[in-house]
Every structure is written in structure tokens, then in C-alpha cells.
Regions:
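Conserved AMP-binding A3 loop
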Residues: 14-17, 137, 143-172
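ATP-dependent adenylate-forming carboxylate-activation enzymes
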Residues: 44, 64-77, 211-220
Length: 220
């Protein structure tokens, strides 16, 4: 909140830091109200992913980052209190039959356990007029955790735990090694944001350096 509020967090479509922060705090408040301690994440949009991670962390929870939608990973995700996603694929994989709407007017999966919060239009509900005031404490706890699961493509899948402090330290180390400054470079990723490299480059490095994110994965 202390950084330039009209700078872009993401492109295509554009998302300013002011609107991004409002979305983080709005979702954080909703997670606190629902007493969510752990959220499983599956996103195509890197900016919505970043918003969800920060919201869970700000609310005092931890995130489980699914490497793909294979059955064993969905079972791992079911150990969380809620799924957060922008993907219709997740809902279909979980086998939901009935759709209701949450307070954002978005589809809410009421049959799966845990529930699925489908958040592709969250930014549309975070205008200054509709958003609650920013909380007094907007800091992310250093000990906030992200649990990443490797795909298992090179052996048995493993769970790696990263803290917010570790991710920031990694991002600062990378920033010192890369020949770029803070001149508005855009981060484009060829892996999903839930991937270990995606989490480092598309999330931590982009936010630490203030570089806008290209929302969609660049598949090649």
C-alpha cells in the first residue's frame, strides 16, 4: 500500500496496484470470516494467483499449490478448507453437479468437500466505492507458508515448504543476479504459477521488483 498505487501489477487486462490491494484485503476478510486455515490453489491467471496467495497469507492461513489436476493432487487439495481457483477445469474434475452463487455473484461449488471459491471476476468487485477500508495491519507474516508439491515427473512427488520470508529472500537474490532494474519489465512465464519456478519468478520476483505480470502462461 505504500508503493505507487497506479503502477500495474498485471497486464492483459491491466490491474493497478490499488485495485490489486483492495482485492487482496477483500478476499482476506472473507477467508477470516470463513475461518479458513488452509487453501488449495489452482489458477491459470498469475495475477489472480498472486492475489489469492497474499490474501490467504494476510488472513493467517497457508496455501497448498497443486502442480496439476491429477487425482492424487486433488486428494491432497481436499485436505484444505477451501479450493481457490479461476478454472472451470477444477470444478469439473471435482465432479460438482450443482452450482450456486457466492456473495461476489460467482459460482460456488456447494457439493464438493472442501468448497470451491471460483474467483475470475474478483477484481470487478473491488472498486473504491464497494470495498471496505484497508486493514490497519497490511503486512504479510514472515512465517506464512506455501506448500508446493512437485509433479513427480523425475521421481516420487515431494512436498516443499516455503515461507514468505524465504520467497522474498530468493527474489532479492535473483534480482541482484539479473541484468534488469525497476524499469517496467513484464514477467512472462512458460510454467504455471503453482510450479516451483513459476512461484519464484511469476509471483515472488514480480511482486518484489514491481514488475507487471503477464497473466497467462506462455506455452512453447
Amino acid at each position: 500500500p505504500d508503493l505507487p498505487q497506479q503502477d500495474l501489477i498485471a497486464t492483459h487486462p491491466n490491474w493497478t496496484r490499488a485495485d490489486f490491494n483492495r482485492a487482496v484485503f477483500l478476499l482476506s476478510g472473507r477467508l477470516k470470516t470463513a475461518n479458513v486455515q488452509t487453501a488449495a490453489l489452482w489458477f491459470d491467471d498469475a495475477a489472480l494467483f498472486a492475489c489469492a496467495v497474499l490474501a490467504v497469507w494476510h488472513s493467517g492461513g497457508r496455501v497448498l499449490l497443486l502442480p496439476n489436476l491429477a487425482r492424487d493432487n486433488l486428494d491432497w487439495g481436499r485436505t484444505a478448507d477451501v479450493f481457490l481457483t479461476d478454472s472451470e477445469d477444477l470444478q469439473s474434475k471435482l465432479g460438482s453437479q450443482t452450482e450456486q452463487r457466492d456473495e461476489f455473484g460467482q459460482p460456488l461449488d456447494v457439493q464438493s468437500n472442501p468448497p470451491v471459491w471460483h474467483l475470475p471476476d474478483l477484481p470487478a468487485h473491488t472498486s473504491p466505492e464497494n470495498s471496505p477500508p484497508a486493514p490497519e495491519n497490511h503486512l504479510i507474516p514472515n512465517h506464512a507458508e506455501a506448500w508446493l508439491k512437485t509433479s513427480g515427473s523425475s521421481g516420487e512427488a515431494q512436498v516443499i515448504v516455503k515461507t514468505a520470508a524465504q520467497m522474498q529472500a530468493e527474489a532479492l537474490m535473483l534480482a541482484g543476479a539479473l541484468p534488469f532494474g525497476r524499469g517496467g519489465e513484464t514477467v512472462i512465464g512458460s510454467v504455471i504459477p503453482q510450479h516451483l519456478y513459476g512461484f519464484t519468478f511469476r509471483f515472488a520476483l514480480a511482486l518484489t521488483m514491481g514488475w507487471p505480470m503477464e497473466r497467462r502462461q506462455a506455452v512453447y
